[in-house]
Swiss-Prot record:
Enzyme nomenclature, EC number: 3.2.1.99
Name recorded for this polypeptide: Probable arabinan endo-1,5-alpha-L-arabinosidase A
Subcellular localization: Secreted
Organism placement in taxonomy: Eukaryota, Fungi, Dikarya, Ascomycota, Pezizomycotina
The family this protein is said to belong to: Belongs to the glycosyl hydrolase 43 family.
Organism listed in the record: Aspergillus oryzae (strain ATCC 42149 / RIB 40) (Yellow koji mold)
Taxonomic superkingdom: Eukaryota
Residues carrying covalently attached carbohydrate according to the record: N53
Endpoints of the signal sequence: 1-19
Function: Endo-1,5-alpha-L-arabinanase involved in degradation of pectin. Its preferred substrate is linear 1,5-alpha-L-arabinan.
Main localization category: secreted
GO BP field: arabinan catabolic process; xylan catabolic process
Reactions catalysed according to its record: Endohydrolysis of (1->5)-alpha-arabinofuranosidic linkages in (1->5)-arabinans
CDD domains: GH43_AnAbnA-like
């Protein structure tokens, strides 16, 4: 009894030290990069991800078992870009009666990029219509037009995007969320080092808009491991408006390096990122992401689907 109590106390203290719950269960097709999560009208979960011209899978539960279904754009993107046959970083949202999937085409590490849009009534394979590009960037721009996320807020549509350079920007979209109606505005910037901010996701909860983003080195951990603490992690800032003035929990502006850590490497979890937030009908707000399980391997192809319920009781998200 004493040994069991001591072990429980040790485990509790360990949990307090790192402060993060382990990822929720996943079975079936769990290898993934840059996930996007949604449910259809009958409650089936759909999960989209980078690779195979936007892979997608379905499951009856967020835990799985996940079944791979195919590709959203099996012939690649219609956008005239060198990355058209390798679209990445999907973001799926329901807009009216349609499912919208925003995606990126680019060459890694360049600004010759575009954010594209595909739509479907059902999300089934073969039903997606590619609408082409809605935001583009080129060498010399302040931003890189990849990693898009749509927030539908009443009658307004906000597209947040960006990666490195001047980091995260936002545009307002038209009523059917198919084209930009504004000039991109900077909403997050880390002035230090290489400005490693990307993968923004804007989520409204209560009276605040929470800007989640990935910070650090994302990929290639099997061949070149970054210095400790420089690997991917998930940060957040918040604002009372969706269009700017985001600050972290210490009051530091998100445009001046602010950002409160939500999830970082812990235990067997390494480099969590590529995140989104989904309002699950049973679990409430859920943070989902990809991560490396250090007991399995560090290659990009070995990254796994992770998720945790979010606690907003303090006014700031914690997992």
């Amino acid at each position: 009894m004493y040994l069991q109590s001591s072990l429980a106390l040790v485990l509790l203290r360990a949990a307090v030290v790192h402060g993060y719950a382990n990822p929720g269960a996943c079975s079936g097709a769990c290898n993934i990069h840059d996930p996007s999560l949604i449910q259809n009208g009958d409650g089936t979960y759909y999960r989209f991800s980078t690779g195979n011209n936007i892979s997608f899978a379905s499951a009856s539960s967020i835990e799985g078992p996940w079944t791979a279904l195919g590709s959203v754009l099996p012939g690649g993107s219609s956008i005239d870009n060198s990355g058209r046959y390798d679209p990445w970083a999907p973001d799926v949202q329901k807009v009216g009666d349609l499912y919208y999937l925003y995606y990126a085409v680019s060459s890694f590490g360049t600004q010759e990029s575009a954010i594209g849009l595909a739509t479907s009534e059902t999300m089934e394979e073969g039903t997606w219509t590619d609408k082409g590009s809605i935001v583009t960037s080129t060498t010399g721009d302040q931003y890189n037009a990849i990693d898009a996320n749509l927030l539908v807020d009443g009658s307004a549509n906000y597209l947040t995007f960006g990666s490195f350079w001047q980091d995260i920007f936002q545009v307002t979209l038209n009523g059917d969320a198919t084209s930009s109606t504004s000039t991109p505005v900077n909403v997050a910037f880390d002035p230090a080092t290489t400005h490693p901010v990307e993968g923004a996701y804007l989520y409204k909860y209560g009276d605040y808009y929470y800007l989640f983003y990935s910070w650090g080195t994302c990929c290639g951990y099997d061949t070149s491991r970054p210095a400790e603490g420089e690997e991917y992690k998930i940060k957040v800032c918040r604002s009372s408006t969706p269009t700017g003035n985001f600050v972290d929990a210490s009051g530091v502006a998100c445009t001046d390096g602010g950002g409160t850590v939500v999830l970082e490497s812990h235990d067997n979890v390494y480099g969590p990122g590529g995140q989104g937030v989904y309002t699950d009908p049973n679990l409430g707000p859920v943070l989902y992401y990809h991560y490396v399980d250090t007991t399995i391997g560090y290659a990009d192809s070995q990254k796994l689907f992770g998720w945790n319920a979010i606690d907003f009781s303090s006014g700031w998200p914690s997992v």
